[in-house]
Structure formats: C-alpha cells, structure tokens
Amino acid sequence: MNKGIIYLIQPAELVGTNRYKIGMSNNPDLERCKKGYKKGSRYLCIMECIKPHDLENKIKEIFNNKFKLIAGNEYFEGDDQVMLKLFLEIIKQHNNTNNDNI
C-alpha cells in the first residue's frame, strides 16, 4: 500500500499572514518537511496517510471551493483554525474510505 505524508504548513516567508500551503510526500518520513522549508515555518499538521497524492488532490479540490487560492494550486488564504479543521476532516474521511484499520 502506498504510504506517505500529507501536511498543512505556513512557510516561513508567509508567517504573519493568513496564507498556508498544502503538501505531500510519498516518503513516510519527515525529510520533505525538514529539508523543504525554512526555519521559522509553522507546521499546523503533518500526518502519515495512504495514497498521499490522491489525498492531496482531494484536499486541494475542497479547499478551492472554501478558500481563496493565492499561488500555484496549493497555496490558500483563510483562517488557520478553519483550514486545519477541514484538513483533518478530509483526512479522516479519506482514511476511512481507503483503510478501515487506520
């Protein structure tokens, strides 16, 4: 089964704004987060998941309908607590759909 991580972060250059980034890695360790973002980044949530690419696409699709897309296809503007709650709900639904043992 394809395991990896999914995350919601505020890169260091966006701290002090209400802008956040969704990301994923097919590698289930934290190397992507450790090496991919500058010191001072805020990590709102990092979770292990199955089918991380599918989950990231699902989150981006739902976030596109709820928040303002500000850059690329994975940077969004909005309230961090609202985003985090929705992010966790989508992950829970995804995990329940794909693996009852998680």
Question: What feature does the model see in each segment?
Answer:
Residues 1-102:
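Non-catalytic accessory segments flanking enzymatic or RNA/DNA-binding domains
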